[in-house]
A protein has these predicted regions:
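Periplasmic c-type cytochrome electron-transfer domains
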Residues: 1-496
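C-terminal cell-surface addressing/anchoring modules of secreted/extracellular proteins
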Residues: 498-500
Length: 500
C-alpha cells in the first residue's frame, strides 16, 4: 500500500523491485493528497531519512512526551498577541511579554483543530503577527493560521536536519493539508449531546460570568467556547477553549490560551508530589481551630502525602510541560485560590472565593473536571456512529436509528443508509433520497421496512459528506445507481490504470 498516491504496488521480493502498481479510489481533495508527504515522508523532509514531522506528531496528533526545544543560539521574539489577561494592568512592565529563546520542556501538541484558532505552539510564538499589521478575527495578524503554520518551515532545518527549508509552494501544500486535520467527536460525551448531572453542573459553572476564578475572568472568559465563531468567514468555524489570544496568568511565561478538545487524551499520569502550587489531595483532615495561618497554609499544601493511584499510562499530563496529573488537581492550583487585593502587586485586585477551599469547593472542581473531559469538538458525538438493522433486531436497533435521525434533523450529521448495494441520503422530515436520480424520495419507515429482505446499515457521517458517500461516489454528477444501470464506473474519476 502506497499512501502518498493511494495505490497498491506489487513487489518482486527476490529482485526487490516493483513489478506493478495501480491507484485506488481516493475521494480526498487534491490539496490533502499533495500535502500529506511533507508530514510523513522522512526521506523528503529530513537529513538521514529517519525523521519526519509525524515522528512526534503521530498521525497529526501527539506522542505523549515533552521536549525542550529552546534554541540557545536564538534571540527573543516579540509577543504581538492580544491578551486575555494583561500584565500591565497589574503594574508589570510591558517588555516581560517577550518570548525568550529558551522555553523549557513542553509537551507535543496535536496538529488537529488548528483552523480558526490563530497562533500556534504553547506560547503562540509561531504566528503571522509582525507588530505592524493589526490582529483581527478571523485571519489577520496573530489570528492568521496560514502564516502561523508557515512559520514552522525553519524546523525542517533546525529540528530534523533538512539541508534547506521547503519551497514556498511545498510549504503551502503542507499548510493546506495540516489545516484540514480535525478533532474527532468526543468519545465520552453522550451520543445525544446531553450531559450528566455532574457534567452539567461543571458546564454551568464554566459559563457563569459571575464566577470569577482567575482574577478577572470566569472560565469561558479566557477559554472561549463558541461553536459558531467566524461562521461564514471560514470553512471550519468555532472556538473550543481558545479564541487565539495570549495571556498573563501568573505563569513562568506568557502562553496562548489553550484549546481544550483533547483533555481526555492526557489522562493517565496518576499522582504527583506535594508542592506549594497545589492543594494536597485531602487538605481538610487534621486542621484544628488553634492553628496559626502559617500552620494552616502548610497543612493545606503539605498536610498529607498524595496517594499512590496505581500504574501509570503516560509519563506526562496536563499543562504545557505535562507536570500536572489530573484536571482536578489543576483546579487546585494556587492561581485559582482566594487571594486578597494587593497580594501580588499593589495593583492586584485579588481573586474572589469562587473555588473555595471547602468540601463544596472540591465538588465544584470535580464537576468542572467531568465537564472538561466531555468538551465540545468541531464534530458532534453522533458523527461516526453506525448500526445495521436486520429482519430480527429491530427491537434493539430501532432506538439507535431513531436517535441518528433525530440528530440528523438537528444538522449534527449527514445520515446515510446502505441496502443491497444501493445508497440513500436522509433529507430531513422523514425522507431519504436514493442513488437513482429520477426516483422519488422514500419515506423513512418504508426504507426501514426493507430490512425484512436485506440488512440496512445506517451511518452518521460528517456534515457535507453524505452526498458523496450515499449518492455519487465520484461526484461526477451521475448518481451511483444510474451508473450501475448504465454499466459505467462510479469510481472512475479517482481510479488509475494498472501499470507494469
Amino acid at each position: 500500500l502506497t499512501r502518498f498516491d493511494d495505490g497498491i504496488s506489487v513487489i518482486d521480493t527476490k529482485a526487490k523491485t516493483e513489478v506493478a502498481h495501480i491507484n485506488m479510489h481516493n475521494p480526498e481533495p487534491q490539496h490533502v493528497k499533495e500535502g500529506r508527504k511533507y508530514h510523513y515522508d522522512a526521506n523528503l523532509t529530513s537529513s538521514h531519512g529517519d525523521s519526519s514531522c509525524a515522528l512526534c506528531h503521530v498521525f497529526g496528533d501527539m506522542d505523549q512526551l515533552a521536549w525542550d526545544l529552546g534554541n540557545p543560539d536564538g534571540s527573543p521574539m516579540g509577543n504581538f498577541s492580544p491578551l486575555a489577561i494583561n500584565h500591565e494592568d497589574f503594574g508589570f512592565p510591558a517588555e516581560i511579554s517577550t518570548f525568550m529563546n529558551m522555553k523549557g520542556p513542553m509537551t507535543t501538541q496535536s496538529m488537529k483543530g488548528m483552523a480558526n484558532h490563530g497562533a500556534q505552539h504553547w506560547r503562540g510564538d509561531r504566528t503571522g503577527a509582525d507588530g505592524v499589521t493589526e490582529s483581527m478575527q478571523p485571519d489577520s495578524g496573530v489570528f492568521d493560521e496560514q502564516a502561523a503554520f508557515k512559520a514552522f518551515n525553519p524546523a525542517f532545518v533546525g529540528l530534523i536536519g533538512r539541508e534547506t527549508e521547503l519551497s514556498a509552494e511545498a510549504m503551502q501544500d503542507y499548510t493546506n493539508f495540516a489545516l484540514e486535520l480535525t478533532y474527532p467527536p468526543n468519545p465520552i460525551r453522550n451520543l445525544d449531546n446531553s450531559l450528566t448531572d455532574a457534567q452539567q453542573a461543571g458546564h454551568d459553572f464554566f459559563f457563569n460570568e459571575e464566577m470569577i476564578v482567575d482574577t478577572v475572568h470566569h472560565c469561558n472568559g479566557c477559554h472561549v467556547v463558541d461553536r459558531t465563531a467566524n461562521e461564514g468567514k471560514t470553512n471550519k468555524p468555532g472556538f473550543f477553549g481558545s479564541d487565539g489570544r495570549n495571556t498573563f496568568a501568573f505563569q513562568t511565561q506568557f502562553f496562548k490560551v489553550p484549546q481544550l478538545r483533547n483533555l481526555y487524551q492526557k489522562v493517565g499520569m496518576f499522582g504527583m508530589a506535594n508542592n506549594n502550587n497545589f492543594l494536597a489531595d485531602d487538605p481538610f483532615s487534621g486542621i484544628t481551630p488553634d492553628m496559626t495561618m502559617e500552620e494552616m497554609q502548610n497543612h493545606l499544601f503539605f498536610g498529607n502525602e498524595n496517594q499512590n493511584m496505581g500504574d501509570q499510562i503516560r509519563g506526562f499530563g496536563m499543562l504545557h510541560d505535562g507536570s500536572v496529573d489530573t484536571i482536578f488537581r489543576f483546579h487546585n492550583i494556587v492561581g485559582f485560590l482566594p487571594r486578597p487585593a494587593g497580594a501580588v502587586t499593589p495593583l492586584d485586585p485579588g481573586n474572589p472565593d469562587n473555588l473555595p477551599i471547602t468540601p463544596e469547593g472540591m465538588e465544584i472542581r470535580r464537576n468542572l473536571e467531568q465537564y472538561m473531559l466531555v468538551f465540545d469538538t468541531n464534530l458532534f458525538p453522533i458523527v461516526g456512529q453506525q448500526i445495521t438493522l436486520t429482519a430480527s433486531n429491530g427491537e434493539t436497533v430501532g432506538s439507535r436509528v431513531d436517535l441518528m435521525i433525530q440528530r440528523a434533523d438537528l444538522g449534527e450529521c449527514d445520515l446515510i443508509a446502505s441496502h443491497n448495494g444501493r445508497g440513500y441520503l436522509y433529507q430531513g422530515k422523514g425522507k431519504f433520497d436514493s442513488d437513482i436520480k429520477k426516483e422519488k424520495g422514500i419515506a423513512e419507515a418504508d426504507l426501514r421496512s426493507l430490512a425484512q429482505s436485506a440488512s440496512i446499515t445506517y451511518t452518521c457521517t460528517p456534515p457535507g459528506n453524505g452526498p458523496r458517500l450515499a449518492l455519487d461516489r465520484d461526484m461526477d454528477g451521475v448518481y451511483n445507481g444510474d451508473e450501475i444501470a448504465a454499466g459505467t464506473n462510479r469510481w472512475k474519476r479517482h481510479c488509475g490504470r494498472l501499470r507494469a
